[in-house]
A protein has these predicted regions:
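Core nucleotide-handling region used for phosphoryl-transfer chemistry
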Residues: 147-171
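Conserved thiamine diphosphate
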Residues: 2-128, 153
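Short, catalytically relevant binding-site loops at active-site mouths
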Residues: 103-104, 135-137, 160-163
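Glycine-rich phosphate/diphosphate-binding loop of Rossmann-like nucleotide-binding domains
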Residues: 128-149, 153-155
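Conserved strand-to-helix beginnings and helix N-cap segments that scaffold or border functional pockets
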Residues: 23-24, 139-140, 166-167
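Short, conserved, surface-exposed binding loops centered on an aromatic residue
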Residues: 88, 119-122, 144-147, 169-171
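Residue-level signal for short, function-critical loop segments
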Residues: 15, 43, 133-135, 159
């Protein structure tokens, strides 16, 4: 298709359909030949509770992570999603980006985004929480509550699930 002509297709649909229903096509027709196609799926996870269980794709990250050569991105908020789209346009190869339905502001405009690099958002000495997507905001809120009780945790935004930032995880 378009990717064989030097263009960069950005495909968009609900995660249930993009990762679930189209899995075989993504695996065989995009990832195996390493076509430069970006799959951006919204309404992922349980953030679409009111839409019912048939639309709650909780397995999309796992499915896309298993596909050889597929890069998997899960932005924490709209600002990070915007930066991820621009980064994916420059990135060569198949990629899946999971977007949630809920608005969860986390970052300022000057927040750095690099595919494959996790970001430490809060330093702590007692424990570390690695989060992606909607859970980044939840982890930051939990860190505030724990800090009030004298427990200092690190919060790491792992927006790139694959390839994982192994150096950040092992630090």
């Amino acid at each position: 298709g378009l990717s064989t002509m030097g263009l960069i297709p950005f495909c968009s649909t609900f995660a249930m359909f993009g990762a679930g229903r189209a899995y075989e096509q993504i695996r065989n027709s995009i990832a195996y030949p390493k076509f430069n196609v970006k799959i951006c799926c919204s309404h992922a996870g349980v953030s679409v509770g009111e839409d019912g269980g048939s639309h709650q794709s909780v397995e999309d990250i796992g499915l896309m992570r298993l596909v050889p050569g597929m890069t998997v991105i899960v932005p924490a908020d709209a600002k990070e999603a915007r930066k991820a789209v621009f980064a994916l346009a420059e990135f060569q190869g198949p990629a899946y980006m999971r977007l949630a339905r809920l608005a969860t502001p986390v970052f300022e405009e000057d927040y750095p985004f690099e595919i494959g690099k996790a970001n430490v958002l809060r330093e702590g000495k007692d424990a570390a929480v690695f989060a992606c997507g909607l859970m980044v905001n939840e982890a930051l809120e939990a860190a505030k509550l724990l800090a009030a009780e004298g427990v200092e945790i690190s919060v790491i935004n792992v927006h790139t699930i694959k390839p994982i930032d192994a150096a950040c995880v092992t630090e």
